[in-house]
Amino acid sequence: MSTPPTAAPIADSVRDISIAHSPDSDDAFMFYGLATNKIRVPGYRFSHTLSDIETLNRRAREEAFYDVTAISFHAYPYLQENYTLMGCGGSVGEGYGPMVVSSRPIAPADLGQMKVAVPGTLTTAYLALKIFNPEIKTETVAFDQIIPAILAGTYGAGLIIHEGQLTYSSSGLYKAIDLGAWWRETTGLVLPLGGNAIRRSLGSEPHRIISKALRDSIRHALDHREQALEYAMQFARDLDSRLANRFVSMYVNDRTLDYGADGREAVRKLLDLGHERGIIPIAPQVDFVD
């Protein structure tokens, strides 16, 4: 899909750009520079809205409301007419990722016999789970209520994302499968989980400028790690600074600055496979702007 050209901005005018992302510590870390005005762009003013990822997925699917929005890669085919992917700001699992956990030790094959709580049907975690085993029965539960629901015995197992990947064992739960590890073993690729999408209608020059601003924000956070982590800690649910640092390190790194050729290949592979398996009804047309 081509990006429409754009006229040069009028001198002294300020263009307002709305950005939406999740209140997760990794997202907060990468947007630290922009959110705190450490990164400024002449002629542009950025506003930030924080919302959980499933809400952002569904909002972007319904309308191109935000100029830039965090999304799960699974959601992209549903909004690709209005949005394109940014070449930076992604979170990928390097042999790790969302996990299915349970209150007792079980084998991955046992998941087909139980109902699994999932954080949303547009999350990439859900897509990976269905590629792994399309027969698994699921029910949507708010992501921060999945572990409590398993402990209460409401569900035999749950698909956990975000910080739950680091804290589940302290709740006495057991890992049935790490979908990031399974994906790496199956495809040899990283598991792309979430990225940032930008409205196509903004045009090529704003795409370039905003992409640079986000990349500069990520680089600033990586270069000023202590301050960025302190900022991100206010969004880190139930994590101490050590675990927050570990979680951010997992999902904000050089891959966040640029997916790399194999990272972009992984995005296409994941979505194409989802389409081939009948999980995604729309043929993906993946493109990136830098």
Regions found by a protein language model. Name each.
Residues 264-267, 272-290:
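Long, low-complexity C-terminal extensions of enzymes
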Residues 14-36, 98-156, 163, 265-268:
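Bilobed "Venus flytrap"/periplasmic-binding protein-like clamshell domains
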Residues 144-234:
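Pocket-lining segment of extracytoplasmic ligand-binding domains
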Residues 17-18, 82-91, 115:
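A structural signal for short loop-to-beta-strand junctions that line the ligand-binding cleft
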Residues 52-54, 60-77, 142-143, 160-166:
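Beta->alpha turn/N-cap motifs
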Residues 85-108, 131, 184-201:
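Hydrophobic/proline-rich hinge and linker segments of small-molecule sensing/allosteric domains
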Residues 203-273:
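Secondary-structure end/capping motifs
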Residues 39-50, 132-145, 280-286:
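A local structural motif
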